[in-house]
Curated annotation (Swiss-Prot):
HAMAP family: EF_G_EF_2_B (MF_00054_B)
SMART domains: EFG_C, EFG_IV
Location in the cell: Cytoplasm
Pfam families in the record: EF-G_D2, EFG_C, EFG_III, EFG_IV, GTP_EFTU
Keywords: Cytoplasm, Elongation factor, GTP-binding, Nucleotide-binding, Protein biosynthesis
PROSITE patterns: G_TR_1, G_TR_2
BP term (GO), one: ribosome disassembly
Keyword Nucleotide-binding assigned: yes
Name of the protein described by the UniProt record: Elongation factor G
Residue ranges constituting the tr-type G domain according to the UniProt record: 8-283
Family label: Belongs to the TRAFAC class translation factor GTPase superfamily. Classic translation factor GTPase family. EF-G/EF-2 subfamily.
Length: 689
């Protein structure tokens, strides 16, 4: 077998979903049926091999993405099991960036939940082909057909149903295979390892033919031969039909839908077949785009072992046995241990020591990795998440990842002098691992401020600091990470002039400040022509604006969603310098504050609340009291689903209040939606602080 033919038998996939939809349970069954492990690890028992952190075992949730490799039907499947909790969405983001395909797991009762929408959009962003697995079909209230409708309505996707469930809720025993038009029934005694094929149940023949017709209509459009056979009324061979589906999945025309119950050991083997049959190999996806460092020209990187080595570092973590581990996805070429590669972002070299295949937190040393592989490198010194590693004679940079801004912060103080130094080391290490985690020191109080994606995120970080680094710390109450922005365009001319005994300082800048749409961040542009300001001084202007916008205008919060355009200025042959222009930019920013309509922004959370009917009035009243607005209400079995938008500042401790008003029967989930202007009374209190 040629090496690139071997590449066609590789699948890099992620398992993604809302929390508690059954991602890790599904992954554990995959590992059992592929022979990767000889027992099934259950999440609720804290025994899932993919949830290896102590915090994951205790909470029964996935916190960090875990990688593993297994084999099925002569194909190698590299799997990344990702978290479903919104606080750890960064793990999903960086995993999807390096994957070729994904399995989206849905709760057969709840269907498409808020975090399902989030991860789906993340997969859309990176054009990741997907398969849907409707899980928990054995649960009371499970409804396969409603879940399929929700995929259309909430995700805007085109589902291609390949299976139908046989039996409802506790009577769910197997599936109808619409490709082969047969039933598949699982044997309970073998933990689902054994199953048998049979006839389609008589009461399902009509609906099976209906969905088979829909399947054929969608799939045959991808192949002329298949279309001709279909319109001539002839049977389309299963192999040709599978090729049509594969092409449609790779082109994101539709999303195959399968069903089962991972916990009851039903439906996992056909899911593995679908991964092999329909999700792309590394050499099926479009060529990766990069930038040639020397020429700044775009380059296309072909996924082949015979090309130059190019890889993306997508995760850095600390292992107590081997130190720093850098996870990479190799897009082209080969990598051997005891060689040297280039970090094209840092323009520095890295020596490759150990190359490791990972199974959760277990390691296997290998001497070589090649295109398509996902491996970990031990002991890299300078590489961080998003950096490109490449051959020394092929300096290219791949597109960097974008990470969300933290929305919550806490003050962290060491309990003793001995903890002081250890805390600095611990936090530096944790921040380097997690791009969604931020740290700074309050210049007035001297307190260390830790910024994260939510209460659980920060709670886990503090817990890791204590367990892994033996640091005891006092933790302040969570605070909202507000932002500031401008609402008007304004032109500012500012002259910085200072004369001391020796050389003076002189810089003149003319800057246009403009508001940008939400989510745009900060943008800087120079329109200097004719040498009004020498090129070497312009970065000083940008640096000055970057530095001062972090200190805010109203209440000391970072300023976002605005553009600064440097369109004119002046310099002095002797007295001008990059520092002078940096100070001039800061002065222009300060002058702009009172003229550009500065406002304070607060994070708004999209909240989904599931409550029994009898508590709906209390729940809605409580939402309104939190400055929230109800956007939508739906019926789901015997419960009401309320979709609301509520300021994060009003969500602290909400879980306790919700349990209290519903006698513990209601539940909720939330994720960041957008920033909105805060009411004047909140603005006044924040300015006082």
């Amino acid at each position: 077998m040629s090496i690139d033919n071997e590449l066609s038998k590789c699948r890099n996939i992620g398992i993604m979903a809302h929390i508690d939809a059954g991602k890790t349970t599904t992954t554990e069954r995959i590992l059992f049926y592929t022979g990767k492990q000889n027992r099934i690890g259950e999440v609720h028992e804290g025994a899932a091999s993919m949830d290896w952190m102590e915090q994951e075992k205790e909470r029964g949730i996935t916190i960090t993405s875990a990688a593993t490799t297994c084999f099925w039907n002569d194909h190698r499947i590299n799997i990344i099991d990702t978290p479903g909790h919104v606080d750890f969405t960064i793990e999903v983001e960086r995993s999807l960036r390096v994957l070729d395909g994904a399995v989206a797991v849905f709760d057969g009762v709840a269907g498409v939940e808020p975090q399902s929408e989030t991860v789906w959009r993340q997969a859309d962003k990176y054009n990741v082909p997907r398969i849907c697995f409707m899980n928990k079909m054995d649960r009371m209230g499970a409804n396969f057909y409603r879940c399929v409708d929700m995929v259309i309505d909430r995700l805007g996707a085109t589902p291609l149903v390949l299976q139908l469930p046989i039996g409802i809720e506790k009577d769910f025993v197997g599936v109808v295979d619409l490709l082969e038009m047969r039933s598949i029934i699982w044997d309970e005694e073998s933990l689902g390892a054994s199953f048998h094929y049979g006839e389609i149940p008589g009461d399902m023949i009509d609906i099976a033919h209906e969905y088979r017709h829909k399947l054929l209509e969608s799939a045959v459009e991808l192949n002329d031969d298949a279309m001709n056979l279909y319109f001539e009324g002839k049977e389309v061979p299963v192999s040709l039909l599978k090729n049509c589906i594969r092409l449609g999945v790779i082109q994101s025309k539709f999303v195959p839908v399968l069903c089962g119950s991972a916990f009851k050991n039903r439906g996992v083997q056909p899911l593995l077949d679908a991964v092999v049959d329909f999700l792309p190999a590394p050499n099926d996806v479009a060529m990766i785009e990069g930038i040639d460092v020397k020429t700044s020209n775009p380059v296309s990187i072909k996924s082949s072992v015979n090309e130059k080595f190019v890889a993306l570092a997508f995760k850095v973590m600390t292992d107590k046995f081997v130190g720093s581990l850098t996870f990479i996805r190799i897009y082209s070429g080969k990598l051997s241990s005891k060689t040297t590669v280039l970090n094209a972002v840092k323009n520095s070299t890295e020596s490759i020591g150990r190359i490791l295949l990972m199974h959760a937190n277990n390691r296997e040393d290998i001497t070589e990795a090649k295109a398509g592989d996902i491996v970990a490198l031990a002991g890299l010194k300078k590489t961080v998440t998003g950096d490109t590693l490449c051959a020394l004679d092929y300096p290219v940079v791949l597109e960097r990842m974008e990470f969300p801004d933290p929305v919550m912060e806490i003050a962290v103080e060491p309990k003793s002098t001995a903890d002081q130094e250890k805390m600095g080391i611990a936090l530096s290490r944790l921040v380097s691992e997690d791009p969604s985690l931020g740290m700074c020191v309050n210049p007035e109080s001297g307190q260390t401020i830790l910024k994260g994606m939510g209460e659980l995120h920060l709670e886990v970080i503090v817990d890791r600091m204590r367990r892994e680094f033996n640091v005891e710390a006092n933790i302040g109450a969570p605070q909202v990470a507000y932002r500031e922005t401008i609402t008007k365009s304004v032109e500012i001319e500012y002259i910085h002039k200072k004369q001391t005994g020796g050389a003076g300082q002189f810089a003149k800048v003319n800057i246009l400040f403009e508001p940008l749409p939400p989510g745009s961040g900060f943008q800087f542009e120079s329109k200097i022509t004719g040498g009004a300001i020498p090129k070497e001084y312009i970065p000083g202007v940008q640096n000055g604006l970057e530095a001062i916008r972090g200190s805010g205008m109203l209440a000391g919060f970072p300023v976002i969603d605005f553009k600064a355009t440097l369109f004119d200025g002046a310099f002095h042959e002797v007295d001008s310098s990059p520092l002078a222009f940096e100070l001039a930019a800061k002065g222009a920013f300060r002058d702009m504050v009172n003229k550009a309509g500065a406002i304070l922004l607060e994070p708004i959370m999209k909240v989904e609340i599931v409550t029994p009917d009898e508590y709906m009035g209390d729940v809605i009243g409580d939402v309104n009291s939190r400055r929230g607005r109800v956007a939508e209400m739906q019926d789901r079995n015997n419960t009401k689903v309320i979709l609301a938008f509520i300021p994060l500042a009003k969500m602290f401790g909400y879980v306790k209040d919700l349990r209290s008003m519903s006698q513990g029967r209601a539940q909720y989930s939330m994720y960041f939606s957008c920033y909105e202007q805060v009411p004047d009374n909140i603005l006044a209190s924040e300015i006082k602080k």
